[in-house]
């Protein structure tokens, strides 16, 4: 989750988020190089004393400023396209989770198991425990197994919502009447926080998401106890 004075992205908890961070750093490096080059050229133009009133055209410089940006765009586009295909790929999921957005809470269904569904509301500030996070903790967490391919189906019951967990690199719009899907792979245990990322009304800020990532054997015990209860 985001912490005070956090300048970078959140620590990744999935391979896809690691790739997104690498691409961010790659694109930022290119932007810094362009900024330095343009700044150097502007500095030289402002402070040199050379004047050439007879320079009307220059084929070489025109070729350079046409070809160089095209090459730079290729260096940005190729890894970007690769990432787009990776984000859309569904790899034989071990478990499917369905998330339904409401004004203003989430409801979840574990499609592979019978009778495993629940609503997830934000815990009000006056009911938080001492170690809780304001506006981020919920009464019912999503429990998912680590080191497993997970497919999530997202929709909405009323208006457009967006199911987002930054540490996993996941952001899926929930649209009434449509079913969007993506997959992710959690590579470490822990709690991962997210929020609705689409303005959906007065209490849009109060729709947190909490994923509890646990080893597979703990997940099986949790599912068994939930089904039996």
Swiss-Prot record:
Requisite cofactors: Cu cation
Binding site for Cu cation A2: 196, 198, 200, 204
Ranges in a coiled coil: none
One Pfam family it belongs to: COX2_TM
Keywords: Copper, Electron transport, Magnesium, Membrane, Metal-binding, Mitochondrion, Mitochondrion inner membrane, Respiratory chain, Translocase, Transmembrane, Transmembrane helix, Transport
An example Gene Ontology molecular-function term: copper ion binding
Keyword Transmembrane: yes
Residues the entry annotates as binding Mg(2+): 198
Cell location: Mitochondrion inner membrane
NCBIfam families membership: CoxB
PANTHER family for the chain: CYTOCHROME C OXIDASE SUBUNIT 2, CYTOCHROME C OXIDASE, SUBUNIT II
Name recorded for this polypeptide: Cytochrome c oxidase subunit 2
Gene name of the record: mt:CoII
């Amino acid at each position: 989750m985001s912490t005070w004075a956090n300048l970078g992205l959140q620590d990744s908890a999935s391979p896809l988020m690691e790739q997104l961070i690498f691409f961010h750093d790659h694109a930022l490096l290119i932007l810094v190089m362009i900024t330095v080059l343009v700044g150097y050229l502007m500095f030289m133009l402002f402070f040199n004393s050379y004047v050439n009133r007879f320079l009307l055209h220059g084929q070489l410089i025109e070729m350079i400023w046409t070809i160089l940006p095209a090459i730079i765009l290729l260096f940005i586009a190729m890894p970007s396209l690769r990432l787009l295909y990776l984000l859309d790929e569904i790899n034989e999921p071990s478990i499917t989770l369905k998330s339904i957005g409401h004004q203003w809470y989430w409801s979840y269904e574990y499609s592979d198991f019978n009778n495993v569904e629940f609503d997830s509301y934000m815990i009000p500030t006056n009911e938080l425990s001492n170690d809780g996070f304001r506006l981020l903790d919920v009464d019912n967490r999503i429990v998912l197994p680590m080191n497993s391919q997970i497919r999530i189906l997202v929709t909405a019951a009323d208006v457009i919502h967006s199911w987002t967990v930054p540490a996993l690199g996941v952001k899926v719009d929930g649209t009434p009447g449509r079913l969007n899907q993506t997959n992710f792979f959690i590579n470490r245990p822990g709690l991962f926080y997210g929020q609705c990322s689409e303005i959906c009304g007065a209490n849009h800020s109060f729709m947190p998401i909490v994923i509890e990532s646990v080893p597979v054997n703990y997940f099986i015990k949790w599912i068994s106890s939930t089904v039996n209860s």
